[in-house]
From Swiss-Prot:
Transmembrane segments: none
Binding residue positions for GTP: 111-118, 188-192, 242-245
Coarse class of the protein's main subcellular location: mitochondrion
Segments of this protein annotated with the region Disordered: 67-96
Protein name: Elongation factor G, mitochondrial
Length: 818
């Protein structure tokens, strides 16, 4: 979409500086701020009057420039042809829409475990007046944090399920001190990698996020995972360095890690006043003022134009650094920088907002949620720098002209349709989370277009069924507030509507559907059975849990007839086993954890397979010709298997193509090497033949299964195992013990860092080699070490391991199948 060049000049400090100009979209392009044409601006106290908007020289508007190489925006770098552009929006925002959306925010809070997300959420609710008392995580006062509403969450001190709430915040205009009320929807997400699906579905429907980092630990394994998820859904983020009161806090090291480890241009917009226990407030580098939290629980804000001498010089350096970073990603600041002119406070703030919304920059805030410092200023930053719902580009797929039989293959070729958050437009919403509530299924919905009303009839696009909305509520953690209607850009919940996570709902006047969220594959499994006689509660619980959580899978092993549950880690499965005991009064016995091995191919293989069966009367005939080849995972969709139909001339009637596709996916369910699912394969159908009488869908499905198995033998199949990124933190004196322990488990050290009396080691280790590691680490560090791990990828097992797995699988097969 963007053409031209990024200027590269030498600044007054004799350092190369890449200056990026803001991209100007054509009249047909839909940019991230596509609704600005309707008067929607988004900063604090934004106005639709011309005086409040940045005036851009028309000559500059005619320039086309490419964003600087340091920018991480995921937008196209070349101009798209007009035929590739989404059609213009069919509806426009009214003045009421503009007024409502301008002061609305939908944000998530995400981070590595124990970075202080839930503590921050608790302070946000307290300062916005949503709760009257502050309660801490782990339920030390027998109450626990508001957003951790499960007993298990309060006992373990971790967030297991994402929790949604809403609040109002009166943001302060830094220029005149006036107040403006903003409505904010907040979703607090888990930090543990085992519950990563909660982060996925939250980010899928949010307009912005707060990335929380520990001032001591910095960027950790789950931080990089959250960063990747934010990029997947193009979610702008502001960063908050929490725990600034801790000994060893070093915010400047963390800012540098955001730039280097997360590859996100970032700069501090604040400098802490005081360190560790002496933390009193922050210096606002943008508006050049000192901000202090005083009074009980930091509720009283004192603003001073006098910067403390102890941090004045550092603040000047960091403000200059902020301007330099902005000059690399924003045209206006870049031009001022090259002309050696100092931008005004307003110009800096506007540039931060533009660059943040365009995914090119992350402003970094600082504070301590536990010590009630910096949270109110962070809320002001949410209002000033993160987008409102109209400033996010939201596209839907128009299914009007799609053939249901081949809709999946046509969808990627269908032009996307922009959705407009106009209240009068046809309703479009996405169900992103399900819960079993006291009054039936609770379905969380993000309304993207139109208005959702109680007792309204809506259509599930996936099933084509019409349903009535019997009850509509807004959620405050586990509390509900009944409402009659809710407008676009809002998040709500419906009772009594049966659906699946990721379903699109409309009012029946449109044929739009939205892409669902990315669902990672499980990496660990174990056998489970009820203790004693099986009860209906056992199957009822399993059915409910796998409906609520797409990463929790249940199946029956055909050989052993055991019930197998699969998930993202040991803790993930342990939590569900414990919930079965507590919520369904069902004690369970579990087997040893099993690693989720996979099979794949390493080379292309042709097939020309004929399925014939004659039983007297109508027989079966189908012939399929084509090839299979290795396929890399698509980083955006997560898909690593694909079916392609290249048949021309009607050699296979189109009504049999879906049967071929079904046969391919059925063949992937169980590989011939170890009986595990097959991944990383593209199936290409080139030709075939049929019989006017004997051909059927069954015949083509069986022919495809036979063809795939025949080709798999020639494609040099291998076995894959999950490899984990393991993050170990321990006192420096135990460094050799930790490294030695990882080496004995065939781990590869990819990074290490020593700071003060503590060190961190990051290694890649096969999950199969990680069982029992917690006991080993505890023994080798005298109980002072801790580790976390997250799934990285599947990699080939060693040849001797593959041989053992194949031999073990062969022993389970009946003699007739060997």
């Amino acid at each position: 979409m963007f053409l031209g060049r990024a200027a590269s000049r030498t600044c007054r400090h004799s350092q190369p500086l890449r200056v990026a100009a803001r991209a100007k979209s054509t009249t047909t392009a839909v940019a991230s701020s596509s609704w600005h044409q309707y008067g929607v601006t988004g900063g604090i106290l934004a106005s639709t009057s011309s005086s409040s908007r940045t005036v851009v020289n028309p000559a500059k508007q005619r320039r086309w420039v490419r964003m600087a190489s340091t920018a991480t925006a995921t937008k196209p770098t070349e101009e798209a042809s007009s035929s590739d552009q989404p059609p213009a929006p069919a509806h426009k925002l009214t003045d009421n829409d503009v007024k409502r959306l301008t002061f609305q925010r939908n944000i998530g809070i995400s981070a590595h475990i124990d970075s202080g997300k839930t503590t921050l959420s608790e302070r946000i609710l307290f300062y916005t007046g949503k709760i009257r008392e502050i309660h801490e995580v782990r339920g030390r006062d027998a109450v626990g944090a508001k957003m951790d509403n499960m007993d298990l969450e309060r006992e373990k001190g971790i967030t297991i399920q994402s929790a949604a709430t809403f609040c109002d915040w009166e943001a302060t205009n830094p220029e005149d001190g006036s107040k403006q009320k903003y409505s904010i929807n907040v979703i607090d997400t888990p930090g543990h990698v085992d519950f990563t699906i909660e982060v996925e579905r939250a980010l899928r429907v949010l307009d912005g996020a707060i990335l929380v980092l520990c001032a001591v630990a910095g960027v950790q394994s789950q931080t990089t995972t959250v960063d990747r998820q934010m990029r997947r859904y193009n979610v702008p983020r502001i960063s908050f360095i929490n725990k600034m009161d801790r000994p060893g806090a070093n915010p400047w090291r963390i800012v540098n890690q955001i730039r280097t480890k997360l590859r996100m241009p970032a700069a501090a917009v604040q400098v802490p006043i005081g360190t560790e226990d002496e933390l009193k407030g922050v210096v606002d580098l943008v508006h050049w003022r000192a901000l202090y939290n005083e009074g009980p629980k930091g509720t009283e804000i004192r603003v001073s134009k006098d910067i403390p001498e102890s941090v004045a010089e550092l603040a000047k350096q960091k403000r200059a650094e902020l301007i330099e970073q902005l000059a690399e990603v924003d045209e206006e600041i870049g031009e001022l920088f090259l002309m050696d002119e100092t931008p005004t406070n307003r110009q800096i703030a506007d540039a931060i907002r533009r660059a943040t919304i365009d995914l090119k920059f992350s402003p970094v805030f600082m504070g301590s949620a536990m010590k009630n410092t910096g949270v109110q200023f962070l809320l002001d930053g949410v209002c000033e720098y993160l987008p409102n719902p109209s400033e996010r580009e939201v596209l839907a797929i128009d299914n009007k002209n799609l053939d249901p039989a081949t809709a999946s293959s046509q969808a990627s070729q269908t032009p996307n349709v922009p959705l407009v958050p106009a209240a009068a437009a046809p309703f479009v919403g996405l169900a992103f989370k399900l819960e079993e509530g006291r009054f039936g299924q609770l379905t969380y919905v993000r309304v993207y277009q139109g208005t959702l009303k109680k007792a309204m009839n809506i259509w599930n696009v996936r099933t084509g069924k019409k349903v009535k909305v019997p009850r509509l509520v807004r959620m405050h953690s586990d509390e509900m507030e009944d409402i009659d209607s809710i407008g676009p850009g809002e998040i709500c919940a419906m009772f009594g509507v049966e659906c699946s996570s990721g379903d699109t709902f409309t009012d029946g006047t449109s044929t739009y559907s939205m892409t669902s969220m990315f669902v990672p594959e499980p990496v660990i499994s174990l056998a489970i059975k009820p203790k004693g006689q099986e009860t209906p509660n056992f199957s009822r619980a399993l059915n409910r849990f796998q409906k609520e959580d797409p990463t929790f899978r249940v199946h029956i092993d055909q050989e052993s007839k055991e019930t197998i549950i699969s998930g993202m880690g040991e803790l993930h499965l342990e939590i569900y086993v414990e919930r079965m005991r507590r919520e369904y009064n069902t004690e369970c016995i579990t087997g040893k954890p099993r690693v989720a091995f996979r099979e794949t191919i390493t080379q292309r293989a042709e097939f020309a397979y004929t399925h014939k069966k004659q039983t007297g009367g109508a027989g079966q005939f189908a012939r399929v010709i084509g090839y299979i080849e290795p396929m890399e995972m698509d980083p955006e969709t997560g898909k690593d298997v694909a079916f392609e139909n290249l048949v021309m001339g009607g050699n296979i009637p189109t009504n049999f193509i879906p049967a071929v596709e079904k046969g391919f996916y059925e063949a992937l369910e169980k590989g011939s090497l170890t009986g595990n699912p097959i991944t990383g394969v593209r199936f290409v159908l080139k030709d075939g033949a049929f019989h006017a009488v004997d051909s059927s869908e069954l015949a083509f499905r069986l022919a495809t299964i036979g063809a795939f198995r025949e080709a798999f033998k020639k494609a040099r199949g291998i076995v894959l195992e999950p490899v984990m990124t393991v993050d170990v933190v321990a006192p420096s004196e135990f460094q050799s013990n930790v490294i030695g322990g990882l080496n004995t488990r065939r781990g590869t050290i990819v990074d290490s860092e020593v700071r003060d009396d503590e060190f961190t080691a990051v290694a890649e280790v096969a999950l199969n080699d990680m069982f029992g590691y917690s006991n080993q680490l505890r023994g080798s560090t005298q109980g002072k070490g801790e580790f976390s791990m997250e799934y990285k990828h599947h990699a080939p097992v060693l040849p001797n391991v593959q041989k053992e797995l194949e031999e073990a699988y062969q022993k389970t097969l009946p003699q007739s199948k060997k």
